[in-house]
Amino acid sequence: MTRKTLGAALITGLIAVGTGAAANEIASGELLAFQCAGCHGFNGHSVGPATPSIAGFSEDYFVQAMLDYKEGNRYATIMDRIAWGYSQEEFEAMAEFFAAQPYLPARQGFDADLAELGADIHDRYCGNCHSEGGTYAEYDSAQLAGQWIPYLEDAFEDFIEHGRPQPRGMQRRLADFSDADVQALIHYYASQQDPAAYVHAD
């Protein structure tokens, strides 16, 4: 199934749930989050390689991402249509729920040599914002480490080719990276599969 068709059958139902809840009272974050499980997995733990895990995400990052989808400010194949059916209050309820869930890195194969190169690239160019090797979801940046390789490839393509919103410094860095640099970073993030690495003291 392609990215364009992935989850398309869920869109009508998801929009109905969001709009119906908003018309009365805000449903619990857990109930709203349940509607995301078809693509993002139970409690935000993705089992589909084209879809990111969203458990443990920063609340502010989650809300802003959903607003960007809803307002057409972020490239999407499906999420813009899904986000349209929810209010900001519902985004905030979902964000609180997902932020409280433990992050489980994807178990997958990776190229160890590329991962070693990627670790050096990350430390030099990406670590100031994506701290702790990309395992730390605070500071309102995305969780990179432990995501599926196909999802990371799509995400980098969105940033580089489709103008996905990003900090100016990140935009400059990505413009300088070769395809090999990007692949090295992706395999570095994919290599981090120890769940203990994602537990950080606040």
What are these regions (language model features)?
Residues 31-42, 64-67, 92-96, 120-132, ...:
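C-type cytochrome heme c attachment motif
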Residues 44-74, 80-85, 119, 131-160:
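Gly/Gly-Pro-rich "capping" loops immediately C-terminal to redox-active cysteine motifs
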Residues 84-106, 150, 173-201:
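C-terminal capping alpha-helices of c-type cytochrome domains
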Residues 19-23:
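Sec/Tat signal peptide C-region and signal peptidase I cleavage site
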Residues 24-43, 106, 110-133, 148-150, ...:
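Sequence/structural segment immediately N-terminal to covalent heme-attachment motifs in c-type
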